[in-house]
Amino acid sequence: MKDGKSLSAYLNAAGKKELANLLKFYCEQAAEEERSELAIWANELREKYYGKKVFFRGLIEFSNHCRNDCYYCGLRRSNSKINRYRLTQSEIIACCKNGYKLGFRTFVLQSGEDPYYTDARLGSIVFRIKELFPDCAVTLSCGERSYKSYKALFEAGADRYLLRHETASQEHYGKLHPPELSLITAKNVYSI
């Protein structure tokens, strides 16, 4: 696969497992020249589909409360050294209004896993944002929730949900999180 055309044909025909194996090979075993060729080809594809654009998102960190006590996280429940806050719906909407004036067309609402923001409360915020700014996307990143919750937030108008997970290794996950949290729960989200 010395030229981009044959590599392109291979990638278009390959399944996920084959792509994963190919990337693993290129990252771990391929010669520097082959890795460089792949990087050049990947950059050409990125430019073909996305151009030289930069996408800006308006990040609104609306709460630093979290019910979890993950060992690495500054928002962890047991961290008594931070001043906790929660933004009201009005404050969140004011952030969106300001961001809209500045040209943002995607708002990312991010928080710890804060039980105060029920589906109804968070859904109301999302609905209001979409009502005021119908040409904007809303992404939520509020930790693990139930399937019912994701569905309710989608129905309220959320366009995306960003669920962070730190690792796919059960052993490593156990070193980062207290026993009451489970990688299996996090992985189940991907089956939705």
Model-derived regions: residue spans:
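Alpha-helical context
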Residues: 14, 18, 32, 38, ...
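N-terminal pre-triad scaffold of radical SAM enzymes
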Residues: 38-78, 84-110, 159
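Residues within well-ordered alpha-helical secondary structure of globular protein domains
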Residues: 25-29, 44, 98, 128, ...
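Core AdoMet radical
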Residues: 77-92, 99-120, 128-192
